[in-house]
Amino acid sequence: MKSTCYMIGILLLILQNTYQSPVPEADGSSRSVKAARNEAVDDSEQLKEVKRHSQGTFTSDYSKYLDSRRAQDFVQWLMNTKRSGGLSRRNADYERHAEGTFTSDVTQHLDEKAAKEFIDWLINGGPTKEIISRRNAEIERHAEGTYTNDVTEYLEEKATKAFIEWLIKGKPKKIRYSRHAEGTFTNDMTNYLEEKAAKEFVGWLINGRPKRKDLLEEH
């Protein structure tokens, strides 16, 4: 009887050990299942990121973030500028430009400066009566055409005088005769007279126009 009970106890222990041994395997399997689920979640998150990049939603979210950041910075800048009073001054300048008052003020300043300089010039002497009368006379002569006539007469007289001197001090007769026949003498004379007249006319303009009386005395 005792042996039978002993055998039954051993069988019960064996059965108990048999049922208890799969428990760690179940725990390990549950952990592996959780790990697999976590990996699946990570993979799904990565797939979502890839899809967002491919669909442009990631870039859109990044742009929204940058826009919101710029908006915050701009609001902060406005608050700081308003405190310092710089914004009101800038708005005033912009309004003046838009209304044209800024340009008008600049024009008015330049006009006042020009008027002041002109008054100072008049006070410090200005044009003398002799200069004014001489200018008026020159204007009248230009209008009547006498100024151009005097210039033409002066050039003709100087050219004639220079041509006579050139003939007196010119080349030998034989050379002049042959050149007359070829026509080169006339061309050279024309060129010389034109150059001489132009040179003397420039000098006449620089040194002042001689009077007609002086020209007559020279001849």
Curated annotation (Swiss-Prot):
InterPro entries: Glucagon, Glucagon_GIP_secretin_VIP
Region of interest (Disordered), ranges: 23-43
Gene3D superfamilies with a match to the protein in the record: 6.10.250.590
One term under GO cellular component: extracellular space
Transmembrane segments: none
Residue positions assigned to the propeptide: 21-50, 84-95, 136-140, 175-178, 213-219
Signal peptide positions on this chain: 1-20
Pfam families (UniProt xref): Hormone_2
Keywords linked to the UniProt accession: Cleavage on pair of basic residues, Hormone, Secreted, Signal
GO function terms (MF aspect): glucagon receptor binding; hormone activity
Localization per Swiss-Prot or TrEMBL: Secreted
Gene Ontology process terms (BP): adenylate cyclase-modulating G protein-coupled receptor signaling pathway; negative regulation of apoptotic process; positive regulation of insulin secretion involved in cellular response to glucose stimulus; protein kinase A signaling
Main subcellular location of this protein, as a coarse class: secreted
Family: Belongs to the glucagon family.
Protein role: Promotes hydrolysis of glycogen and lipids, and raises the blood sugar level.
Name this polypeptide is given: Glucagon-2
Lineage, opening ranks: Eukaryota, Metazoa, Chordata, Craniata, Vertebrata
